[in-house]
Amino acid sequence: MQNIDLISEKEAQKLLEELADKIAAYNHAYYIEDNPLVSDSEYDQLFNTNLKLEQKFPHLILENSPSKKVGAKIANKFAKVTHQVPMLSLSNAFDEQDVRDFVDRIKNFLRLNEFAPIFCEPKIDGLSFSAVYKNGVLTTGATRGDGYVGEDITANIKTIKNFPHKIDNVPEFLEVRGEIYIEKQDFLNLNKEQEEQGKDKFANPRNAAAGSLRQLDASITAKRPLKYFVYSGGVTEQNLASSQDQLLTKLKECGFNINEISKLASSEEEIFAFYEYLKTNREDLPYEIDGVVYKLNDFALQNRMGFIARSPRFATAHKFPAIIGQTQLLSITVQVGRTGTLTPVAELEPIEIGGVTVSRATLHNFQEIARKDVRIKDYVFLQRAGDVIPKIMGVDFDKRPNDTATFDTPLFCLSCNSKLHYMPEDIIIRCDNGLNCPAQNYERIRHFVSKNAMDIEGLGRKQVEFLIDKGLISNPLDIFFLKEKNDSSLAKLENMDGWGKKSVENLFKNIEKSKNVSLPRFIYALGIRHIGEQNAKLLAREVGSYNNFIAQMELLRTNEPDIYQKLNNLEGIGDKILVDIIDFFDVKENIELIKKLGEILNIEDYKETREQSSLTDKIVVFTGSLPTISRAEAKATAEKLGAKVTAGVSSNTDLVVAGVDAGSKLKKAKELNIKIIDEEEWLTLIKNV
């Protein structure tokens, strides 16, 4: 077989025609005549060659392509793509004060005396993408995914009209980022086609764009009216330009679509004027927008500000006001989460708000129901802002029917019937029955296998529920013995409703694959209360390895003061979260489960992804007022260089940077003979590393 990387377009066309005929013959023999002509591996090699050719030359996809045929073995998932620079989300601003706070944070962080120009642009309500060019040729298209790892959509992105496949006069490696969307009228036309073909309609333009782009068959994507805008670079933007406005000008010259509706603001007044203009005229735009994005225009200043865990410090999204609607509340159901918290949910007469069909809304907590006097059959006001879960704002008392019914706060868990525990002020109600509560156990397993945890594909909500109901799994550990149990059972999983030979084979492969897991993902997968992805990374970074994690958690539960203080010094981990961690490890079954998982999983040690330097893993404390840089900038720089910045001085501290009016921390550092430097020495140090 020819090397696909070197093949010409003419050769590819001929080879695709040959493959189509050959695979069609093999499909007929295999599926119709039950008489395979080639081995599975030989068939797969031919089929994969066809797919790779179509990915490289999507405009050459044939009408009789084997990738379109029912009998063909179409790939069941996209390849993973790791983003060299994370595609983080933006922080939100909901009113003018939030925006002023954003501007003030920039001034304070950078110690600026005047307004730094802000680039303003519409926030398109679409699907984020990354496109990588090597030597000017598009090589990879990817979704944002979880911000760190996305899905390879190269073949699909090449089908979008006017999307450049080749560009000139750019660096050897170039990444651009943007938004793929569907215009309003195209969305209506697409839904009309879906309805005529007896298919489900899309809820909104964003879902339509996402569903169209994430097609395993690129020819389906090609038929969808997708459009795009680029709005930033990734790895190389500073090599192209020194500011956001210059970058967009350069990208436009390269042939990319940019949104011409933008504003370089030189004051807060200009920011708000642009926001009001877009808010007033948003309905006249051909596409959906849900706010305005503000970015520091100067890339050098952006670089100084850097990022926090989930978003850049130098940008924010000013969201448009929430859209209000009214509908009838049909009933109130109660959900039990993986940590036992009970949440009331309003079941509603379906209503369309801002292009989205809403049939459920959050009621937050039981006290909220009483405070707002919400009753079953009431007509309620709903609020929806962006992708936030809709919430009930209040009741239309003028329309209250005579037959409304009040909702009684439960005294016993609806899943396990154990007595509920009322938290302070009755705001939170919790079932403390742990894994003996079926609902908590189910949610815990669902969390364990989820994408950002163990990432076991093929174990969705329905599959987990099925396996629990059939007694095949009762805890996360059972998942890894599922194949062994299935092999020895007379009632095979592949013969049960909703399963098949291929889906079961894929599930077992994915379970096996998941056994190699990073320490942060493993900690997150455990489902400890208040330990989300970021806190899991903080803990993983602190302990370093699985064995250290187990050892330190067991010391923590025995109230070892040094361990408690060390973890308490981590930013994001405080007394409340430490209590939750201790409560989790106080449960004997939890420790046993984690140790057994440790025996069968390959839990990788924490890998530092930040810059490595002489400051890496050094514990640094800043105290007093620094003359020329803000404390926030100093802390951000230290962390970027691999240091751990803590709030308090201890015997573990490596360095104290003391500014003006340094107090007790400086005194303690001297008592412990810890190295102390001033701001000037700090700036020299970071310059040299």
From Swiss-Prot:
One GO cellular component, as annotated: cytosol
Stored HAMAP family: DNA_ligase_A (MF_01588)
Cofactor: Mg(2+); Mn(2+)
Ranges where the BRCT domain occurs: 610-689
Function: DNA ligase that catalyzes the formation of phosphodiester linkages between 5'-phosphoryl and 3'-hydroxyl groups in double-stranded DNA using NAD as a coenzyme and as the energy source for the reaction. It is essential for DNA replication and repair of damaged DNA.
PROSITE patterns, sorted: BRCT, DNA_LIGASE_N1, DNA_LIGASE_N2
Biological processes per GO annotation: DNA repair; DNA replication
Similarity comment: Belongs to the NAD-dependent DNA ligase family. LigA subfamily.
NCBIfam families recorded: dnlj, PRK07956.1
Documented EC number(s): 6.5.1.2
Record organism: Rickettsia massiliae (strain Mtu5)
Active site, per annotation: K123 (n6-amp-lysine intermediate)
Annotated gene: ligA
Keywords, comma-separated and alphabetical: DNA damage, DNA repair, DNA replication, Ligase, Magnesium, Manganese, Metal-binding, NAD, Zinc
Sequence positions that bind NAD(+): D40, S41, E42, Y43, D44, S89, L90, E121, R144, E179, K295, K319
InterPro entries per the UniProt record, alphabetical: BRCT_dom, BRCT_dom_sf, DisA/LigA_HHH, DNA_ligase, DNA_ligase_AS, DNA_ligase_CS, DNAligase_adenylation, DNAligase_N
Catalytic activity entry: NAD(+) + (deoxyribonucleotide)n-3'-hydroxyl + 5'-phospho-(deoxyribonucleotide)m = (deoxyribonucleotide)n+m + AMP + beta-nicotinamide D-nucleotide
Pfam families: BRCT (PF00533), DNA_ligase_aden (PF01653), DNA_ligase_OB (PF03120), HHH_2 (PF12826)
Binding site for Zn(2+): C413, C416, C431, C437
Molecular function terms from GO: DNA ligase (NAD+) activity; metal ion binding
PANTHER family found in the cross-reference section: CHROMOSOME TRANSMISSION FIDELITY FACTOR 18, DNA LIGASE
Protein name: DNA ligase
